[in-house]
Curated annotation (Swiss-Prot):
Name of this chain's protein: Protein RALF-like 28
Biased composition (Pro residues): 75-85
GO molecular function: hormone activity
Organism encoding this protein: Arabidopsis thaliana (Mouse-ear cress)
InterPro entries assigned to the protein according to its UniProt record, in alphabetical order: RALF (IPR008801)
Similarity comment: Belongs to the plant rapid alkalinization factor (RALF) family.
Function description: Cell signaling peptide that may regulate plant stress, growth, and development. Mediates a rapid alkalinization of extracellular space by mediating a transient increase in the cytoplasmic Ca(2+) concentration leading to a calcium-dependent signaling events through a cell surface receptor and a concomitant activation of some intracellular mitogen-activated protein kinases.
Keywords: Disulfide bond, Hormone, Secreted, Signal
Subcellular location: Secreted
Length: 85
């Protein structure tokens, strides 16, 4: 029975150490947050002042894709034979 008690005691100590280690790492993760200065001024062109900028245009215009059920991406499937053996 003493081996079982020692094993339980060891597991409790190991869990406590793991919890302390994880909680210390959580504080470091919270500190690595990107703020507004890190993001810069956005996608504006250099030298673009107020009122002198061309209008924004999307890089890739949206086009709705084709669904597989509509079969518009490839040839039609082969026709089924009329007689099934």
């Amino acid at each position: 029975m003493s081996i079982l008690k020692e094993t339980k005691r060891f597991m409790v100590v190991a869990m406590f150490i793991a919890c302390v280690f994880i909680s210390n790492n959580m504080n470091v993760a919270v500190a690595n947050e990107i703020g507004y200065p890190g993001m810069g001024r956005g996608d504006r062109q250099p030298g673009c002042d107020h009122g002198n900028c061309p209008p924004d245009q999307p890089a890739n215009p949206y086009h709705r894709g084709c669904e597989k059920s509509k079969r518009c991406r490839g040839p039609d499937p082969p026709a089924l034979p009329r007689k099934m053996i």
